[in-house]
């Protein structure tokens, strides 16, 4: 949330610099990410000056350009080519000089000397939208005749500077979602640190009802969802541009001024955290505001022009005939104030956080109002803010306050009563804090001391502190204001440590595999278990019907639990690729979740749900980057296969005991599965389909492996580590060049080889593949190396030849192989 330094000073007096304020707020739990100097107009109009057009003639090479000379108040006139249709001699204009930076949203461009259709142009005569003082681009700005050439534009437009503090508000601190809320905490900090400070806010004592010419009735039909609703009317207003001071306040914190009435409501919400809504009173049919729910499926068009279907639990603000606003979330298209509005009805309410949160999530909306209502605002500030808003409307838009405040309140919000003992304060904080200091802190935080004893205090905590309802909550507040850095580390630490205990084998092996992968150049990633259900639309390998859906998702992008780690990794790859980092190796350990409707059991609610622990590997980009020693070499699925095999070896699995099969589905264009002999799937790895990559805007090939960690742990239960002496006898290598059908895979050769010679054959490796000229159609050549070794003697040629002859015969019989 953006907090204005100068605005903050209106509520609490201090002599701290912006950086000191940021440090103070961070120290008391309102973490401030940064301090930025800003101006009411982006860029501060630096480099812009007022000029006078001395001459203006048509460009010889254009039918719409003009060549002008402009007096910038610095002596010699400046030549500028201008394309605006309204440029003329004698005008006072705004000129961007060489080197000036102009902003278009987040983009910036610099004014440079240029030639336009062969004529030199030194600068630019500007339109409103080009310098950020308006939205018109119909022509250049023409200033009044009394504008003085050479005057800096920032002085002419009275550009103000301020500092914006980026305060990160945690979900429990709804009370700090405003300038006044932050000022309250800063005031407590100042008092604790011995500084003279006072907390103030504008008085509304001057509020007075002038007549009863526009009386609008208020009815609340659902007091659970709306415990308090208040409204007042102002008649005879003029909707127009806000005064400069109000526009500047909003611009500084990043808001765009709209008109005086709307700007007042935005000012109030950012000043005091109370969302307001302004209705055109003449559009309230029947002269009554009704707070209620609507039938399921009712359509309603919001301010953004989107037609939405309402849920029966969406609280609505209605008139006698129509819905006007989604309560606490978003206004309607046809009920708000416009430039033609003359009478307004101002709403100030307290809506139940849960109702607002669920409605906002259902419609995928996140507004300034819903952000505050769903966290819980101060129910007792509604009337104050309503009075202040009405007074401001009267002052800035004219008119008269034309009704009594209609305040429908089921029951006034009560303070939270908390019993606090000094002993517990000392126990939780770890330091004895004097009672007077504790009383000073709680008082500065607007907690009332209802009773006091030698043992502690009875406190009344204001209802806007929704996060402080227990003694431990109060103690946390005491600690953050007292200062975490003021609690010394004790000279002795009491702890209970043991060096004995059960070691989780799975965790230990996970760490070993993680270290192995990191050593191979992988980076570990951690993705959210929540993901987007749309990823699974139309998939057969991971059907949408098996998704574990969230009843109340944070957003449409986080509305289900993941069935696979794949999509999170592809998001990470896309994120890195967009930042010019395309050579990637990722791994992730995480749970995957599954729903099976066939397992539903009324007596076991969780029966249809399951989760498995998986390891995902992603490889993409180059395996070797271009250098003096190596040319570029792209990674391949075989590299991924090696990583998978090495993981199996690290876990102690015998690769020859596993069953490998082919796979091609909507995830992989080509892949292999690795199963136990009992049919349990241990891993799948292969090439991700182009269609899948396109959905994530990934251009490079991606190779993905999915290892079921749970099944791997089961598979290695019987694995035992054995040790043996290194053989004293040499190993012998024999190579074969085999002519085979193209459909034959190396895995088949490997399997036959190990079945043929189980004792002496130690390794089978493929070192060359050839397909092309001089081979029969449909054939390919494999060059395969066989490593033989006897642990008890040196192998002689006769023994080796016997093994190789048997091996060749089996390859010929089973695969139709021929020696080349």
Swiss-Prot record:
Cellular compartments annotated: Cytoplasm
CDD domains xrefs: PheRS_beta_core (cd00769), tRNA_bind_bactPheRS (cd02796)
Keywords linked to the UniProt accession: Aminoacyl-tRNA synthetase, ATP-binding, Cytoplasm, Ligase, Magnesium, Metal-binding, Nucleotide-binding, Protein biosynthesis, RNA-binding, tRNA-binding
SUPFAM superfamilies xref list: Anticodon-binding domain of PheRS, Class II aaRS and biotin synthetases, Nucleic acid-binding proteins, PheT/TilS domain, Putative DNA-binding domain
Gene Ontology BP, a term: phenylalanyl-tRNA aminoacylation
The protein's Enzyme Commission number: 6.1.1.20
Primary location group: cytoplasm
Catalytic activity, reaction form: tRNA(Phe) + L-phenylalanine + ATP = L-phenylalanyl-tRNA(Phe) + AMP + diphosphate + H(+)
Name of the top EC class for this enzyme: ligase
Cofactor descriptive note: Binds 2 magnesium ions per tetramer.
Pfam (any one): FDX-ACB
Family: Belongs to the phenylalanyl-tRNA synthetase beta subunit family. Type 1 subfamily.
Subunit structure: Tetramer of two alpha and two beta subunits.
Protein name as annotated: Phenylalanine--tRNA ligase beta subunit
Protein species of origin: Bacteroides fragilis (strain YCH46)
């Amino acid at each position: 949330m953006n907090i204005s330094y100068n605005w903050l000073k209106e509520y609490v007096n201090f002599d701290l610099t912006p950086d000191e304020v940021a440090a103070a707020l961070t120290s008391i739990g309102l973490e401030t990410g940064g301090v930025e100097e800003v101006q009411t107009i982006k860029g501060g109009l630096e480099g812009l000056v007022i000029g006078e057009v001395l001459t203006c003639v048509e460009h010889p090479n254009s039918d719409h350009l003009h060549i002008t000379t402009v007096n910038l108040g610095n002596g010699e006139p400046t030549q500028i080519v201008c394309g605006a249709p309204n440029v003329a001699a004698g005008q006072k204009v705004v000129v961007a000089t060489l080197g000036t930076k102009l902003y278009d949203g987040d983009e910036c461009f610099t004014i440079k000397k240029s030639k336009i259709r062969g004529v030199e142009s030194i600068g630019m005569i500007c339109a409103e939208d080009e310098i950020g003082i308006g939205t018109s681009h119909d022509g250049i700005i023409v200033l009044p005749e009394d504008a003085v050439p050479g005057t800096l534009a920032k002085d002419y437009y009275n550009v103000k500077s301020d500092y914006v503090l980026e305060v990160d508000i945690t979900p429990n601190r709804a009370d700090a979602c405003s300038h006044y809320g932050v000022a309250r905490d800063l005031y407590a900090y100042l008092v604790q640190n011995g500084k003279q400070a006072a907390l103030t806010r504008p008085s509304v004592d001057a509020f007075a009802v002038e007549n009863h010419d526009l009386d609008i009735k208020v009815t609340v039909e659902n007091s659970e969802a709306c415990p308090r609703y208040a409204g007042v009317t102002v008649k005879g207003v003029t909707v127009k541009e806000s005064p400069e001071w109000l526009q500047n306040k909003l611009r500084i914190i990043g808001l765009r001024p709209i008109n005086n009435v709307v700007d007042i409501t935005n000012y109030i919400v950012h000043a005091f955290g109370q969302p307001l809504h302004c209705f055109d009173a003449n559009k309230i049919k029947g002269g009554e505001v009704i707070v209620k729910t609507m039938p399921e499926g009712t359509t309603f068009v919001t301010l953004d022009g989107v037609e939405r279907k309402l849920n029966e639990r969406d609280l609505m603000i209605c008139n006698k005939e129509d819905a006007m606003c989604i309560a606490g979330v978003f206004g309607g298209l046809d009920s708000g104030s416009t430039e033609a509005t003359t009478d307004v009805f101002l709403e100030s309410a307290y809506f139940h956080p849960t109702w607002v949160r669920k409605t906002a999530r259902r419609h995928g909306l996140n507004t300034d109002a819903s952000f505050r209502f769903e966290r819980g605002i101060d129910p007792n500030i509604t009337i104050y803010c309503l009075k202040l808003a009405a007074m401001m409307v009267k002052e800035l838009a004219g008119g008269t306050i034309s009704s009594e405040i209609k305040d429908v309140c089921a029951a006034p919000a009560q303070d939270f009563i908390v019993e606090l003992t000094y002993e517990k304060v000392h126990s939780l904080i770890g330091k004895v804090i004097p009672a007077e200091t504790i009383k000073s802190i709680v008082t500065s935080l607007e907690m009332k001391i209802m009773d006091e004893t030698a043992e502690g205090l009875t406190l009344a905590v204001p209802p806007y502190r929704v996060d402080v309802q227990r003694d431990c909550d109060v103690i946390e507040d005491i600690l953050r204001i007292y200062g975490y850095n003021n609690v010394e580390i004790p000279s002795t630490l009491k702890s209970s440590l043991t060096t004995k205990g059960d070691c989780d084998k799975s965790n230990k092996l996970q760490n070993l595999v993680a270290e192995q992968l990191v050593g191979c150049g992988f980076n570990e990633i951690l993705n959210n278990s929540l993901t987007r259900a749309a990823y699974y639309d139309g998939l057969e390998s991971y059907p949408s019907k098996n998704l574990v859906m969230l009843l109340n998702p944070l957003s449409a992008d986080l509305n289900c639990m993941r069935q696979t780690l794949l999509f999170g990794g592809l998001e990470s790859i896309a994120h890195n690729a967009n930042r010019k980092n395309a050579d990637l190796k990722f791994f992730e350990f995480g749970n995957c979740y599954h729903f099976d409707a066939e397992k539903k059991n009324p007596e076991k609610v969780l029966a249809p749900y399951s989760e498995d622990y998986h390891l995902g590997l992603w490889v993409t980009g180059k395996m070797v980057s271009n250098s003096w020693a190596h040319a570029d070499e792209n990674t391949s699925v075989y590299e991924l296969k090696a990583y998978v095999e090495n993981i199996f070896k690290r876990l102690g699995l015998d690769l020859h005991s596993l069953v490998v099969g082919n796979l091609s589905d909507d995830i992989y264009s080509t892949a292999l599965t690795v199963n136990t002999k009992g049919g349990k799937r241990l891993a799948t790895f292969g090439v991700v389909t182009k269609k899948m990559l396109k959905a994530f805007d990934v251009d490079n090939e991606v190779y993905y492996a999915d290892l079921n960690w749970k099944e791997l742990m089961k598979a290695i239960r019987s694995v035992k580590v054995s040790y043996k002496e290194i053989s004293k006898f040499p190993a012998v290598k024999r190579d074969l060049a085999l002519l085979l059908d193209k459909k034959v895979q190396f895995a088949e050769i490997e399997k036959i080889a190990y079945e043929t010679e189980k004792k002496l054959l130690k390794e089978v490796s493929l070192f060359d593949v050839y397909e092309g000229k001089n081979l029969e159609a449909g054939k390919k050549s494999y060059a395969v190396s066989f490593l033989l070794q006897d642990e008890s003697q040196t192998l002689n040629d006769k023994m080796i030849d016997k093994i190789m002859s048997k091996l060749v015969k089996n390859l010929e019989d089973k695969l139709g192989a021929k020696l080349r």
